[in-house]
Amino acid sequence: MEPPGPVRGPLQDSSWYEPSAELVQTRMAVSLTAAETLALQGTQGQEKMMMMGPKEEEQSCEYETRLPGNHSTSQEIFRQRFRHLRYQETPGPREALSQLRVLCCEWLRPEKHTKEQILEFLVLEQFLTILPEELQSWVRGHHPKSGEEAVTVLEDLEKGLEPEPQVPGPAHGPAQEEPWEKKESLGAAQEALSIQLQPKETQPFPKSEQVYLHFLSVVTEDGPEPKDKGSLPQPPITEVESQVFSEKLATDTSTFEATSEGTLELQQRNPKAERLRWSPAQEESFRQMVVIHKEIPTGKKDHECSECGKTFIYNSHLVVHQRVHSGEKPYKCSDCGKTFKQSSNLGQHQRIHTGEKPFECNECGKAFRWGAHLVQHQRIHSGEKPYECNECGKAFSQSSYLSQHRRIHSGEKPFICKECGKAYGWCSELIRHRRVHARKEPSH
């Protein structure tokens, strides 16, 4: 019997691929985990995907939900949850297996992807896993969608390491040294970068020195030097290079020191550490990266509020918190003049003026202004009712419905008529009662 041919369309033949209330609940749990992760990483500039609305703009807890364009991020979150789920986190073996199925489906999306695409996801994941540690951050920073793209990134990196033909030029004496000229050729820095492609046990230099020299190769590689170096635009430092350098710098004890002449020295065990001259712009870029490195969290909350004693991992979070005490609201809406403590709250508020509704339901296409409203709406499709009454066990899809239901047990009547003082448990009852007074009023 011949084996079946490859499946070309999305996989749809298993019942546990279908969306369920369990899948929606897991999506919400993973979204909360994503928001906490982003907060720990100090990514203040990232857009907050899930907000509770303008009435809760002062709350510091914000949630994240998946949007079109953020699919790769959420897919990576589900992949990590699938790989790192622990048995102790689940009520029992059946629940553990069920949650793994849900996370696997949300990561690989068999209802959307073909068998070949799913195999490519798995091969790419394993390929990135077997890469040397020094290259994993580099390749992941390019967000490859397939194994071929990952290989292309590595091949491009290797091409950059190929030695260039030496062009003879006039010798320069010490008096002719330029402000940002290296005393040795660029080939030494590129050679240090090539060391990162070797296995760890064969690397002749400490990690920090490799990263430092690699960083120098990035900020100085500009091809042939022009005659007028004063007008040369400084090579920019890319986000990926910054990330790689910061990660390596955080794991090493070497010290980088800037002298008053703009010369950066690497104080390292190797006595042959290079001495390099940079332009002021390049030195400032390096200083900014060192500042970013100092913000890398150690897990300790070292930043304490002098007003209330609350502590934070990031100093930037402390600055935002202190506005609660000072009342400062530096972000102002240009349309209505309303002010806010955080820029993210201003961005949410501006949706009222623009009419933007970025949160769209995948089931019916209905759009919402706030992520919380989308979550509530999706419970209509999933049938999820997470809010349960402690008195009678009745469940509800929204917390407001549960609050209204509890008045039946408590006898609370918060809606009071201003005319006669009569109280009601429901707003609709008060509205009907007011019509009685309206009919009794004499007509003019």
Curated annotation (Swiss-Prot):
InterPro entries listed in its UniProt record: SCAN_dom, SCAN_sf, Znf_C2H2_sf, Znf_C2H2_type
Start and end residues of each SCAN box domain: 79-161
Keyword Cell membrane included in the entry's annotation: no
One of the record's GO cellular component terms: nucleoplasm
PANTHER family, per the entry: ZINC FINGER AND SCAN DOMAIN-CONTAINING, ZINC FINGER PROTEIN 232
Role summary: May be involved in transcriptional regulation.
Similarity comment: family membership: Belongs to the krueppel C2H2-type zinc-finger protein family.
Protein name stated in the entry: Zinc finger protein 232
Gene: ZNF232
